[in-house]
């Protein structure tokens, strides 16, 4: 039990509410789970779903994918979206932004595109790639409502330098990727 940021009680089973002193807590060294490894939960900053469920889909699929990852130790995640239409990306960014208010394990959105070099698109649909315009950037930032955490951009594209500056000024980490840049 925690009170005012301090451990106030320890125990197991029905005794967990037993009052104790801080000296008892400090002296407690035994941990159940011999042979197990205790670590903080994992944080995934680039994942597209799991268990057949996609972060590109509806809330129930997003929650199902998150449940799969949570059961395996990933306690928090930035949900990645691949390049899609501006309408799809803004709708998903808004959906994920709303979910951050009810699920502390959802940290926000990583936009992997749509401002990528077509020659280095990987699995991205070439029809979904676009130039970075101020209107598109503003729409994505507005939809994300402060929860877009990262975006992948090809810096050589027209409008990319201004786009990068706008995202950085909004507190979004910008990753260089799917690019023809070579140094």
Language-model regions, residue ranges each:
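Conserved beta-strand segments that form the floor/walls of ligand-binding pockets within enzyme
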Residues: 1, 38, 44, 110, ...
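Histidine-rich, glycine-flanked metal-binding segment
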Residues: 1-39
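Divalent metal-coordination and catalytic microenvironments
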Residues: 5, 35, 46, 69, ...
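Metal-associated gating/positioning segment near the N- to mid-region
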Residues: 36-88
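A structural micro-motif
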Residues: 23-24, 28, 36, 75, ...
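Histidine/acidic-residue-rich, glycine-tolerant segments that coordinate divalent metal ions
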Residues: 59, 85-183
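Short, intrinsically disordered, charge-balanced linker/junction segments flanking boundaries
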Residues: 6-8, 62, 182-183
């Amino acid at each position: 039990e925690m009170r005012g940021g301090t451990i106030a009680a320890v125990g197991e089973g029905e005794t967990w509410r037993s009052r104790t002193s801080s000296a008892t807590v400090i002296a407690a060294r035994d941990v159940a789970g011999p042979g197990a490894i205790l670590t903080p939960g994992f944080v995934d900053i680039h994942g597209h779903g799991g268990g057949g469920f996609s972060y590109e889909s509806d809330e129930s699929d997003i929650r199902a994918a998150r449940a799969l990852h949570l059961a395996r130790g990933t306690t928090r995640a930035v949900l990645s979206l691949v390049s899609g239409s501006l309408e799809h990306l803004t709708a998903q960014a808004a959906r994920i932004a709303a979910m951050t208010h009810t699920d502390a394990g959802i940290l926000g959105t990583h936009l992997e595109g749509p401002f990528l070099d077509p020659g280095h698109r990987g699995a991205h649909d070439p029809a979904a790639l676009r130039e970075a315009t101020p209107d598109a950037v503003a729409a994505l930032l507005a939809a994300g409502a402060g929860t877009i955490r990262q975006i992948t951009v090809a810096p050589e594209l027209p409008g990319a330098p201004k786009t990068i500056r706008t995202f950085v000024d909004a507190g979004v980490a910008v990753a260089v990727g799917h690019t023809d840049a070579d140094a």
